[in-house]
Regions:
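Cell wall/extracellular polymer interaction/catalysis modules
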Residues: 24-188, 195-209, 216-234
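Bacterial Sec-dependent N-terminal signal peptides
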Residues: 1-29
């Protein structure tokens, strides 16, 4: 009876408690077995098995859902656990549940050779930074058509703008470089793309979409506030 009276009071007082079903493409972060199944279903429906690391994908999706000020249903994942010789950048259309792009992408020259193993948020480090970003506006600069990135994680990537970390095309990110040197060329910390595909990718992800740069680094996982709840359950 007490519960009934409380319920009547809440309704009459105008209090509304929303109940929503969890979804891998939604903006909520609700941890439940059904939600994990939903993410697995999304992964399967996009036919990502053998193409995308599921652990990286799930982290990217969970972070995407937790970032409320995103303006696009587009998610970009860069998987730095893979070598530069492999296509390790993925762009997903979360609304229509499909992968739009899969491309090579360079890492910072001081992050490693073929593999990126060291990361930094410091100016002049010439290293890549992990974590979640929001894309902003484009401009034409020294590297041509470029996309500004806003690092969302304090102490991890929040100096991205100060460091001029942007998405841009570069000749050293072209596939032909791999044939000559055994790995892709490296940037000063930017996620640089092959020149032929850089503009289409930038246009697809600009204007407030989420980007997640992943690597298997325990120190990042320990520091990330965006993924703290997720990692405790994985």
């Amino acid at each position: 009876m007490r519960n009934i009276l409380i319920s009547i009071f809440l309704v009459c007082s105008g209090f509304v408690v929303p109940v929503m079903a969890p979804s891998c493409a939604s903006g909520m972060l609700v941890h439940s077995p059904s939600e994990v199944d939903e993410c697995a279903g999304l992964y399967a429906s996009m036919q990502l098995e053998g193409v995308v690391n599921y652990k990286a994908f799930r982290q990217a999706v969970e972070g995407y859902r937790k970032i409320e000020n995103r303006h696009r249903d587009i998610l970009t994942l860069i998987d730095f656990s893979k070598p530069s010789t492999e296509k390790r950048l993925y762009v997903f259309d979360m609304k229509n549940r499909k992968m739009l792009f899969n491309s090579l992408v360079s890492h910072g020259r001081n992050s490693g050779g073929n593999y990126a193993t060291s990361f930094s948020n410091e100016y002049g480090s010439y290293k890549s930074s992990l974590g979640f970003y929001l894309t902003e506006t484009t401009y034409n600069g020294g590297n041509g058509y470029s996309l500004i990135l806003n690092g969302l994680e304090k102490g991890i990537n929040d100096k991205a703008k100060e460091r001029a970390i942007v998405v841009h095309g570069a000749s050293y990110a072209n596939p032909s470089v791999i044939k000559g040197g055994g790995r892709l060329g490296r940037s000063l910390g930017c996620p640089a793309l092959p020149q032929k595909i850089s503009k289409p990718i930038i246009d697809a992800i600009k204007g407030g979409s989420v980007m997640y740069i992943y690597a298997e680094k325990p120190e990042y996982f320990a520091q990330s506030e965006i993924l703290s709840d997720v990692l405790n359950e994985m």
